[in-house]
Amino acid sequence: MIETDVLVIGGGPAGSSAAKHAALGGAKVILLDKRSEIGAPKRCAEGVSKKGLAKLGIEPSPRWITKEIDGVRLTSPDGTDVWLTEEEIELPEAGYILERKVFDKHMAMDAARAGAEIRIKTLATGMDKIEDGFIVSTESMGKTEEIKAKIVIAADGPEGHVARWAGLKGSAKAKEMESGVQYEMVNVEFDREAVIEFYFGSCAPGGYVWIFPKGDDIANVGLAILQHKATKPAIEYLDDFIAKCPATKNAQAVELNVGGDPVGGMPKKMYDDNILVCGDAAGQVNPLTGGGIISGMTGGMYAGQVAAEAIKEGDHSKKFLKKYDKITRDDLSHEIDKYKKVQEYMLTLSDEELDNIAHAFQDVNFEKISTTELVKALVKVSPKALLKLGKFI
């Protein structure tokens, strides 16, 4: 039987962040990933903020950045555009479009450089509680092994099993799981190629369509919907949008990505004896945008740091590990809760109301733009928004 201090299950950005920081803290760490290649297939639109990377101490690298973003375009159902570009306003949440296949791999490499052992093509198939830890059953290329860990960090995504194996609730109920589908496309025709575009309304019930540029004529074009608000599968909404949108009507798909996005917020408990949960598995996702790379890596960082402290102290109990829950909520919960309320408000809006807001935004003088500033502007132009969101500004 293999023994380790910390076993991280899931090699996405959150898991690699957890493994890296646990190893930096002096713990013996193993990181498992079921895929044969970390980072593939990608399952997101690949956007991150510069501020978020800086907070995590990650230096931007041309190896995994495909485009620097200097603006945002918001489009309502009737085609009214709200342009928010760096030429006119400050963009504190400006960022990059990544190449996730490369980024994720480099984050795993950082974990390895910190001292973590990485095992690819290794699936966790079960987990049994023992007196002070877990025994995790694994399967890799026809070979079965058991790993005994003092602390398990579950970073196995929104459909993961590890937290539930430990008796914890998952990150999202079915109705709070967005269905996402995306093409990487070529021959996309941009009005401005360094601007990310969002389209709202019945084109994507309960969510939105995005166009994220990755090159001169290359973009991620996708959408996320709440299936209980929809009348057909997500892929049909996306294909309909692509056929009608001037930017994409002549484009060709070279890659298809699908996945679920938990937008219900963090569960009540992300820890127990000998276990921590982070990333999408812990609902560490912005409910409004569905973005979870930076927040998931932040949760992973805290999980790794607290796990390493617990190993040093020889205390792997839920009483000690609760520290992770507190630190993470202190950092992330205000933003997640706020954007959950905005998302719930957006779900109440008809196409006509979205158009009216876009028309009203034409007269708003933005000095800087972030998601928070957009919420403030929304409250100014919509009395309905003031009632629901006023306390968050």
Curated annotation (Swiss-Prot):
It holds the Pfam family GGR_cat. Its cofactor is FAD. Keywords: FAD, Flavoprotein, Lipid biosynthesis, Lipid metabolism, Oxidoreductase, Phospholipid biosynthesis, Phospholipid metabolism. It is an enzyme of class 1 (oxidoreductase). Its EC number is 1.3.-.-. Pathway: Membrane lipid metabolism; glycerophospholipid metabolism. Binds 1 FAD per subunit. GO terms for molecular function: flavin adenine dinucleotide binding; geranylgeranyl reductase activity; oxidoreductase activity, acting on the CH-CH group of donors, NAD or NADP as acceptor. It catalyses: a 2,3-bis-O-phytanyl-sn-glycerol 1-phospholipid + 8 A = a 2,3-bis-O-(geranylgeranyl)-sn-glycerol 1-phospholipid + 8 AH2; 2,3-bis-O-(phytanyl)-sn-glycerol 1-phosphate + 8 A = 2,3-bis-O-(geranylgeranyl)-sn-glycerol 1-phosphate + 8 AH2; CDP-2,3-bis-O-(geranylgeranyl)-sn-glycerol + 8 AH2 = CDP-2,3-bis-O-(phytanyl)-sn-glycerol + 8 A; archaetidylserine + 8 AH2 = 2,3-bis-O-phytanyl-sn-glycero-3-phospho-L-serine + 8 A. GO terms for cellular component: membrane. GO terms for biological process: glycerophospholipid biosynthetic process; membrane lipid biosynthetic process. FAD binds at A14, D33, C44, A45, G47, R100, A124, D280, G292, I293. Coiled coil: none annotated. HAMAP family: DGGGPL_reductase. Is involved in the reduction of 2,3-digeranylgeranylglycerophospholipids (unsaturated archaeols) into 2,3-diphytanylglycerophospholipids (saturated archaeols) in the biosynthesis of archaeal membrane lipids. Catalyzes the formation of archaetidic acid (2,3-di-O-phytanyl-sn-glyceryl phosphate) from 2,3-di-O-geranylgeranylglyceryl phosphate (DGGGP) via the hydrogenation of each double bond of the isoprenoid chains. Belongs to the geranylgeranyl reductase family. DGGGPL reductase subfamily. PANTHER family: DIGERANYLGERANYLGLYCEROPHOSPHOLIPID REDUCTASE (PTHR42685:SF18), GERANYLGERANYL DIPHOSPHATE REDUCTASE (PTHR42685). Reduction reaction proceeds via syn addition of hydrogen for double bonds. This is Digeranylgeranylglycerophospholipid reductase. It comes from Methanobrevibacter smithii (strain ATCC 35061 / DSM 861 / OCM 144 / PS). The lineage of its organism: Archaea, Methanobacteriati, Methanobacteriota, Methanomada group, Methanobacteria.
